[in-house]
């Protein structure tokens, strides 16, 4: 159960997320820092519902661009959401790792999202795949010919990994 303070904080966080989605979605680009703040808020909100058996690690520390790097808004959220949707199992220990690095000398951004892989069961009939299509559409629209996207399973299928490199 949540305390009133936790509930208030969660509602404020949700409000920030919704404002970002509504107002920044129309922009061609946002600062990388703004996009990172959005991801951090999303991760913090999602942590509230997770059991202690789930490890969530983020590393956004290396992202210091002084507002000089811009990305398409909401470009990474589908992959982060997928990690929380598919990377958690109530029956076993699970993990999610998210990292963003920006190298100004190479003018390169690297986004990595990894999670424990819990394949869908035959009972899970929820539709899927739209998030990955949206990521590809955003990459093609915003960075035609200037990105690499690798995704799939690693460690004998135990880990799902997605890595995007964007060249500015």
Language-model features: locations:
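C-terminal coupling/interaction segments
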Residues: 166-168
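Two-component histidine phosphotransfer core
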Residues: 1-154, 159-163
């Amino acid at each position: 159960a949540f305390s009133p303070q936790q509930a208030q904080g969660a509602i404020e966080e949700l409000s920030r997320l919704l404002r970002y989605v509504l107002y920044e979605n129309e922009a061609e680009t946002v600062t990388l820092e703004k996009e990172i703040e959005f991801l951090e808020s999303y991760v913090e909100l999602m942590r509230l519902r997770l059991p202690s058996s789930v490890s969530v690690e983020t590393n956004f520390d290396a992202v210091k661009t002084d507002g000089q790097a811009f990305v398409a808004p909401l470009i990474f959220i589908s992959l982060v959401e997928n990690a929380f949707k598919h990377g958690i199992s109530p029956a076993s220990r699970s993990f999610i790792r998210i990292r963003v690095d920006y190298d100004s000398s190479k003018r390169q951004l690297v986004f990595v999202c990894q999670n424990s892989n819990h394949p869908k069961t035959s009972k899970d009939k929820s539709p899927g795949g739209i998030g990955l299509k949206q990521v590809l559409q955003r990459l093609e629209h915003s960075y035609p010919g200037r990105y690499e996207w690798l995704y799939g399973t690693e460690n004998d299928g135990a880990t799902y990994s997605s890595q995007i490199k964007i060249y500015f």
